[in-house]
Amino acid sequence: MSRIKLIVGLANPGAEYAATRHNAGAWYADLLAERHNQSLKEESKFFGFTARLNLGGEDVRLLVPTTFMNLSGKAVAAMATFYRIPAEEILVAHDELDLPPGVAKFKQGGGHGGHNGLKDIISRLGNNQNFHRLRIGIGHPGDRQKVVGFVLGKPQAAEQRLIDDAVDEAVRCTEVWMKEDRLKAMNRLHSFKAG
C-alpha cells in the first residue's frame, strides 16, 4: 500500500488569484481540510498554509504554498525535508490543461507538462519526479499563446460547477486511497462523470 504523508495544493497567493483556474489545487486542499474540521494556518518556516489531518489512521500534513506558483518547490522541499518525507509519499494537487473541467485523475511520476509549479517541485526535490499527482481538469483555451491568461482567469459558472464536482469527488477518493487502497481510489476517480 502506498502511503501518503504530505498533500500539497498548488496555488498563487493572495485574494486576486484565489478564484483563478491555476488555484484548483488549493480548492482541493481547502475542501480536504474542511471535511476533517481543520483549518489551514500560515506557517512561515514552510512558506505556506499548513494543517495536520488523520486520514485512514495516517498522520498527514497538508500544505498550500504561499510562494508564487513557480517557487512552489521551496515550500514542498522545506516540509518534506523537515518531516523526512520521501517524494513517493507526496501527493501534489494541481490544475491540468490537458483534462476537461469535471475530470480529475491520480498519477505517479512523469514530467511537468509545462506546469511551473511541478517544474519547481521536481527541481527542488533533486530532480525526483516520483511524487504522486492529482490532476484537476480545467480545460485548454485551444491556443498556446492564450494559456497564461486562461490559467490566471476565472472559470465561467458552468465550468466552475464541473471543477467543484471533480474536486469534491477527488477528496472522497483521497479518503478511499488512505483508508483502503490507491488502485480502488484511482478506479473510482477515473470513472467519475461530473454534472
From Swiss-Prot:
Hydrolyzes ribosome-free peptidyl-tRNAs (with 1 or more amino acids incorporated), which drop off the ribosome during protein synthesis, or as a result of ribosome stalling. This is Peptidyl-tRNA hydrolase. It comes from Erwinia tasmaniensis (strain DSM 17950 / CFBP 7177 / CIP 109463 / NCPPB 4357 / Et1/99). The gene is pth. InterPro entries: Pept_tRNA_hydro, Pept_tRNA_hydro_CS, Pept_tRNA_hydro_sf. The record marks N12 as: Discriminates between blocked and unblocked aminoacyl-tRNA. The active site is at H22. It comes from the Bacteria. It is an enzyme of class 3 (hydrolase).
